[in-house]
């Protein structure tokens, strides 16, 4: 069957002009005009999408099939062009019968030409074919318009859905024109209103926690500059942490007798609830004879030294992708969970604005991965925000997953961000050593976002920087009061 693209070529119908007319009609629609006025950043993103629209319209015309009636008429016209005037006069009754049978718009005009001229001359033959061709061009142009109008309606419906989605998410995720462009590209997926409203919800939560948003922006845009000390530079106070052995809550090492109420074994605590044994419990408490967990580890104290002030700064290090690990243990539920998810959303905003990748890993008893900056970033973000934090804590697996990811060539300059309350077992030595190697040799930076003031020093000391956001009730009230 004849395709519309072939018919356009045969009749020299310019499809480009028709396509441009449809594009201009689409851009002039009231829906787009209002949207561009409300979200000017997204106007450029939609303008960059125009080549894709043109290609979609061309593809529609290229693949479209010409109706059988029009195909038969075109084939008859082509055959008639090859006939001389004498042969054409012989075939003329069959041609007129065909035009009437196909209900061709040219049938009446053709019959009138024949009836009004007793003699069919070569000039009349040429005029007959010229008007027939003109009729075919009109029919072909109308068919082009019909198909492109259907495509325009479908395209407008798609654009309206994407505009609704992008308009809702633009205040949350689009910081600049580049971010708006990437957000528009991501909006091509099939999403329902109830899905992306989850992103809006956490965006509103982030707006209510300006300190958390500010912290995410500081972390996301922190860069270390290369520097050298200047001669005769003044001295400044430099504080370092020095490790020394101590009995601190680091690792369970056994059982001992003491009066440490916080480390009581459950059986000892149970005796306190038995009336007959209550006095016995107090006696053993005074004599420090209660069975408690024995904890050993390493403590750190601050050492103050003097060193020359660093003055000269050179080029800043390039900013690479984010690899964000989020603790989904039970202790991270509730307000901690909201803060962790909102923090990741803020990092996604930074990544979109700075053209960086943002890779999320959830760790509890297993590792789940999401990439928030890819073509399906919005869908991935919705899946991440839908997760519930109810697992255990396996921070060692988290670090091993980060180390494995950083071995890839595309992650050679990545920054690792671990969001947790850091109430967990100490890290194995092989993990600590590998992290140190990545920091020294490959200049990877490891950031900790501590959601609790009780994180274990043995875990947190391996990070290059610790960003603290205490989610305790006292800190939350203080932050609200300061606002």
From Swiss-Prot:
The keyword Chaperone applies. SMART domains: VWA (SM00327). InterPro entries: Uncharacterised_CoxE, Uncharacterised_ViaA, VWF_A, vWFA_dom_sf. GO terms for cellular component: cytosol. It is found in: Cytoplasm. Its main location: cytoplasm. The keyword Cytoplasm applies. Coiled coil: none annotated. Keywords: Chaperone, Cytoplasm. Pfam families: VWA_CoxE (PF05762). Component of the RavA-ViaA chaperone complex, which may act on the membrane to optimize the function of some of the respiratory chains. ViaA stimulates the ATPase activity of RavA. Belongs to the ViaA family. Homodimer. Interacts with RavA. This is Regulatory protein ViaA. It comes from Citrobacter koseri (strain ATCC BAA-895 / CDC 4225-83 / SGSC4696). The lineage of its organism: Bacteria, Pseudomonadati, Pseudomonadota, Gammaproteobacteria, Enterobacterales.
């Amino acid at each position: 069957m004849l395709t519309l693209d072939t018919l356009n070529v045969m009749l020299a119908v310019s499809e480009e002009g028709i396509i441009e007319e449809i594009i201009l009609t689409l851009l002039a629609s009231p829906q787009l005009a209002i949207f561009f006025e409300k979200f000017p950043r997204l106007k450029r993103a939609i303008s960059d999408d125009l080549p894709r629209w043109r290609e979609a319209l061309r593809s529609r015309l290229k693949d479209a099939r010409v109706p059988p009636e029009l195909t038969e008429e075109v084939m008859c016209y082509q055959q008639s062009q090859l006939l001389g005037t004498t042969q054409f006069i012989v075939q003329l009754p069959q041609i007129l019968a065909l035009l009437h049978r196909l209900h061709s718009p040219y049938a009446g005009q053709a019959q009138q030409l024949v009836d009004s001229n007793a003699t069919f001359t070569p000039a009349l033959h040429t005029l007959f074919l010229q008007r027939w061709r003109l009729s075919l061009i009109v029919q072909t142009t109308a068919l082009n318009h019909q198909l492109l109008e259907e495509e325009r309606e479908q395209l407008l419906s798609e654009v309206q859905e994407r505009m609704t989605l992008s308009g809702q998410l633009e205040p949350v995720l689009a910081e600049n024109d580049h971010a708006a462009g990437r957000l528009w590209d991501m909006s091509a997926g099939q999403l329902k209103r109830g899905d992306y409203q989850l992103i809006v919800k956490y965006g509103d939560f982030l707006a209510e926690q300006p300190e958390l948003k500010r912290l995410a922006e500081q972390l996301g845009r922190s860069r270390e500059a290369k520097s050298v000390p200047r001669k005769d530079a003044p001295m400044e106070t430099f504080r370092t942490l020095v490790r020394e052995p101590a009995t601190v809550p680091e690792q369970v090492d056994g059982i001992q007798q003491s009066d440490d109420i916080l480390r009581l074994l459950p059986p000892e605590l149970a005796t306190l609830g038995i009336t007959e044994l209550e006095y016995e419990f107090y006696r053993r408490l005074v004599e420090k004879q209660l069975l408690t967990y024995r904890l050993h580890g390493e403590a750190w104290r601050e050492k103050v030294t003097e060193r020359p002030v660093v003055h000269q700064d050179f080029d800043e290090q390039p900013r690479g992708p984010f690899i964000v690990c989020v603790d989904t243990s039970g202790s991270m539920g509730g307000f901690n969970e909201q803060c962790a998810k909102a923090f990741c959303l803020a990092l996604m905003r930074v990544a979109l604005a700075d053209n960086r990748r943002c890779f999320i890993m959830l760790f509890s008893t297993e590792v789940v991965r999401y990439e928030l900056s890819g073509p399906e970033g919005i869908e991935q973000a919705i899946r991440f925000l839908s997760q519930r934090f109810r697992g255990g804590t396996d921070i060692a697996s988290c670090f091993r997953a980060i180390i494995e990811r950083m071995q890839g060539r595309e992650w050679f300059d990545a920054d690792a961000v671990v969001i947790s309350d850091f109430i967990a077992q100490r890290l194995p030595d092989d993990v600590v050593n590998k992290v140190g190697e990545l920091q020294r040799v490959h200049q990877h930076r490891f950031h900790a976002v501590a959601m609790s003031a009780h994180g274990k020093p043995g875990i947190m000391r391996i990070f290059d920087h610790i960003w603290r956001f205490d989610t305790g009730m006292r800190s939350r009230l203080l932050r609200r009061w300061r606002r």
